[in-house]
From Swiss-Prot:
<dbReference type="GO" id="GO:0006508">
    <property type="term" value="P:proteolysis"/>
</dbReference>
<keyword id="KW-1003">Cell membrane</keyword>
<dbReference type="GO" id="GO:0030163">
    <property type="term" value="P:protein catabolic process"/>
</dbReference>
<dbReference type="GO" id="GO:0005524">
    <property type="term" value="F:ATP binding"/>
</dbReference>
<feature type="active site">
    <location>
        <position position="525"/>
    </location>
</feature>
<feature type="domain" description="Lon proteolytic">
    <location>
        <begin position="433"/>
        <end position="618"/>
    </location>
</feature>
<comment type="subunit">
    <text>Homohexamer. Organized in a ring with a central cavity.</text>
</comment>
<dbReference type="GO" id="GO:0016887">
    <property type="term" value="F:ATP hydrolysis activity"/>
</dbReference>
<keyword id="KW-0472">Membrane</keyword>
<dbReference type="Pfam" id="PF01078">
    <property type="entry name" value="Mg_chelatase"/>
</dbReference>
<dbReference type="Pfam" id="PF05362">
    <property type="entry name" value="Lon_C"/>
</dbReference>
<dbReference type="InterPro" id="IPR046843">
    <property type="entry name" value="LonB_AAA-LID"/>
</dbReference>
<keyword id="KW-0547">Nucleotide-binding</keyword>
<dbReference type="InterPro" id="IPR027417">
    <property type="entry name" value="P-loop_NTPase"/>
</dbReference>
<keyword id="KW-0067">ATP-binding</keyword>
<feature type="topological domain" description="Cytoplasmic">
    <location>
        <begin position="1"/>
        <end position="123"/>
    </location>
</feature>
<dbReference type="InterPro" id="IPR014721">
    <property type="entry name" value="Ribsml_uS5_D2-typ_fold_subgr"/>
</dbReference>
């Protein structure tokens, strides 16, 4: 049973706080994740056992926070520094060595000190030789009384200096210093590396191009090696969001790294000098957390997914949570967290908390639920805070949150507002009077953008009936860039108006136009509107233009629930309509802002008959239509299944016989 919880206003006013400043914000990141209890427990188990995880869910539901929180539960293991050394036998195959965390810097420093000492000794030797040559030249010039000998001695010293200073063999000391690829301090937490959107070089490692490849000017191969994110995540967590957007080759490389726990670094560009360099396998023992939306699995490498399933977990995160006391407290904690993280906005008072919770109810799109698309809700919190700061307030109030909702409307809502104004000016839909075959349908835009906020629009639908070109060859013609689901919805609806009108439509062409749908129409939520417009056109019964409607329709005439019903009702209010018909099952899902309450009559409908009774204008034709519908209902017979005979009854009958 659903929990009967008090209104948001009553609940918030009972809280023993003045502002969100009085709310305790947990220090542990895991405890800051809101509404993902089941996913959180699985992620925690995965971290303790070093298992891989796939997190699937809508954007902004806490997938990256769950992944990042895993580092707090990873078993304590010794972090390692990774160094790359030159290979005297094969310069293009540098050697790899791992040492305990913090030791890598010491080793590199020791090699640098050794190289500097050898460099100083070499410099002293060179200077000694040069001075000796010059001194011998001066002595020879004095003995032989020839000044030119001094000139030749200086020239010889100069050539000798250049030969010794730039000799590749002598310069080899610098080339022998190893490079530190991955460095840690002894007390560091396990690394968390976000590799979302990383290219191949950043993900798998790369070898930089060397423009000077010969003549003693080249950079040693090991100094050009760069660690990839898979190596930086060694002994930690590698997080990749939108895993399906990675190239198949990169996904295959990650699979290899998961299997072998090491992966060599090579040049990623075949046109680079680094393409010829490949290191020894570099350790990359990481926990992979792959995340994505619901379509991520479709384009994910099957072998990679199989590997994760075999050695880890697949988790679908929640999009909403129950609207109860515990979860409301979590939402208040979320507001406090956002204020603490931002550090630039004031805390929220009780009136502002009420508005945020109501917005969470509204964005969930379902009764007795709260949205978990908290990234977008956090955006509302920050905008409200900015408004309060601009007005030099010390706390955020309800007025600031309401202003934020108007100021930070999604792009689709801003476009829809302008579209409604244009449609009103040019009268592409009407808000009063009655017209045959014309219905004010309702639709949403932004449903395919990944945003949690739907934007409602009025969708005029016009139907007209004409004689078919050929006898018995009537067609249903729908225009307006309909998608596949919308086209199928038109065919399904045809069963309804064939049944209700009782007329042979084989000699009719039924034209259905979705007015002004330049961006196209998809979905079946206009089914009720289509049926009403067509029945109106066939029966010549006007439709009340102050009524809007939405709802899907079964082939038997039942009105089925649809999405975005609150946004659609708001669109009807903004358009100035008086009534809106919604599916009965969606009626309790509607949550309106205070400025929209009591501005429109909301009528729930269970069947198409309920819709027609409200939408069609009273007339003799309407009475005839409903008499016909009544006869159809009375003529329907319900066959009850016979109860099968029990063994006892059968035996009794046999005995009686």
């Amino acid at each position: 049973m659903e929990e009967n919880i008090e209104s948001v206003e009553e609940w918030v006013n009972k809280l023993d706080i003045e502002t969100t400043k009085d709310i305790h914000v947990p220090k542990l990141l895991f405890d800051q994740v809101i509404g993902q209890d089941q996913a959180g427990e699985i992620v925690k188990k995965a971290a303790l056992q070093r298992r891989h995880v796939i997190l699937i869910g809508e954007p902004g539901t806490g997938k990256s926070m769950l992944a990042q929180s895993m580092v707090d539960f990873l078993p304590k293991s010794e972090l390692e520094d990774i160094l790359v050394f030159p290979n005297p036998e094969d310069p293009n195959k540098p050697k790899i060595k791992t040492v305990p965390a913090g030791k890598g810097k010491e080793i590199v420093r020791q090699y640098q000190i050794k190289a500097e000492r050898e460099k100083r000794d070499r410099s002293r030797s060179i200077m000694f030789v040069i001075f000796s040559v010059v001194l011998l030249g001066i002595i020879a010039a004095i003995v032989l009384r020839s000044i030119t000998l001094i000139f030749f001695a200086i020239m010889a010293a100069a050539f000798l200096y250049m030969a010794m200073a730039f000799n590749p063999v002598i310069r080899n000391e610098r080339a022998m210093v190893p490079k530190l690829l991955v460095s840690h301090n002894p007390n560091d937490k396990p690394p968390f590396v976000d590799s979302t959107g990383a290219h191949s070089g950043a993900l798998l490692g790369d070898v930089r191009h060397d423009p000077f490849q010969s003549g003693g000017l080249e950079t040693p191969a090991h100094e050009r090696v760069e660690a990839g994110n898979i190596h930086k995540a060694h002994k930690g967590v590698l997080f990749i969001d939108e895993i399906n957007l990675l190239r198949p080759e990169d996904q295959q490389a990650i699979l290899t790294a998961l299997q072998e726990k090491k992966y060599p670094i090579s040049g990623q560009s075949e046109r680079s000098a680094g393409a010829m360099v490949q290191t020894e396998p570099v350790p990359c023992d990481f926990v992979l957390v792959a995340a994505g939306n619901y379509d991520a699995i479709r384009n994910m490498h099957p072998a990679l997914r199989s590997r994760i399933r075999g050695y880890g977990y697949e988790v679908v995160v929640n999009d909403y949570m129950d609207d109860n006391d515990e979860n409301r407290r979590k939402l208040v904690q979320f507001i406090a967290q956002e204020v603490e993280k931002d550090k630039k906005i004031p805390h929220f008072d009780k009136s502002a908390i009420i508005e945020v919770i109501k917005e969470a109810q509204k964005r969930s799109g379902r009764r007795n639920k709260l949205t978990l698309r908290l990234r977008e809700l956090g955006g509302l919190v920050r905008v409200a805070g900015d408004i309060a700061v601009s007005q030099k307030k010390t706390v955020v109030t309800a007025a600031d949150v309401i202003a934020a909702k108007n100021l930070a409307k999604p792009l689709e809502q801003q476009i829809a507002d302008r579209s409604i104004e244009i449609k009103k000016i040019y009268k592409t839909f009407r808000t009063e009077g009655s017209v045959v075959g014309m219905v004010n349908g309702l639709a949403v835009v932004g449903a395919d953008t990944g945003m949690s906020e739907y934007t409602g629009v009025v969708l005029p639908i016009v139907a007209e009936v004409t004689p078919a070109e050929h006898k018995g060859a009537g067609n249903i013609i729908a225009t307006g860039k309909l998608g596949d689901i919308a086209k199928e919805a038109v065919l399904n609806v045809s069963a309804v108006f064939k049944k209700l009108t009782g007329k042979d439509i084989s000699n009719m062409d039924i034209h259905i136009q979705f007015v002004g749908t330049y961006e196209g129409v998809e979905g079946d939520s206009a089914s009720v509107s289509i049926a009403t417009a067509v029945i109106s056109a066939i029966e010549n019964i006007p439709v009340d233009q102050s009524v809007a409607m939405t709802g899907s329709l079964s082939v038997r005439g039942d009105v089925l629930p649809v999405g975005g019903v609150t946004a659609k009702v708001e669109a009807a209010i903004e358009a100035g309509l008086n009534k809106v018909i919604v599916p009965e099952l969606n009626y309790s899902d509607i949550i309106l802002d205070a400025d929209h309450v009591n501005k429109i009559e909301i009528i729930p409908a269970k069947t198409i008959e309920d819709v027609l009774r409200v939408a069609l204008v009273n007339s003799p034709e309407k009475e005839k239509l409903f008499d016909r519908i009544s006869n159809l209902i009375n003529a329907a017979k319900i066959i009850k299944p016979q109860r099968p005979a029990t063994p006892a009854t059968t035996r009794a009958g046999n005995n009686a016989a």
